[in-house]
Amino acid sequence: KLVDTANFDDYMKALGVGFATRQMAGLTKEISFKLDEEFDETTADDRHVKKLILTLTMGNVVSTRTYPTTI
C-alpha cells in the first residue's frame, strides 16, 4: 500500500525517467478489484470505461478496457 510519495519525482528523475512519464506517475491511484469481474474506471483523460482484469500464468496480469460506443 502506498503510504508516501515524498521525493518520488526526484527519484524518478535520477533514474532517467522522462518528464511526461513522471507526470503520469503522479496521477496514479489505488484501486480495488476482483479478478474476472468487470468494474467502472475513469481514465487519466476523464473517460468512463469498463475494465476487466484477468490473470495469466507466471504472475503476468492482463487488463482490457471497454469504451462506450456512441450512435
From Swiss-Prot:
PTM info: The N-terminus is blocked.
GO CC annotations on file: cytosol; nucleus
Alphabetical list of Gene3D superfamilies matching this protein: 2.40.128.20
Keywords: Lipid-binding, Transport
SUPFAM superfamilies, per database record: Lipocalins
Disulfide bonds: none
One BP term from GO: long-chain fatty acid transport
Coiled coil: none
One term of GO molecular function: long-chain fatty acid binding
Family named by the database record: Belongs to the calycin superfamily. Fatty-acid binding protein (FABP) family.
Annotated function: May be involved in the regulation of smooth muscle contraction by transporting polyunsaturated fatty acids (e.g. arachidonic acid).
Protein name: Fatty acid-binding protein, smooth muscle
Taxonomic placement: Eukaryota, Metazoa, Chordata, Craniata, Vertebrata
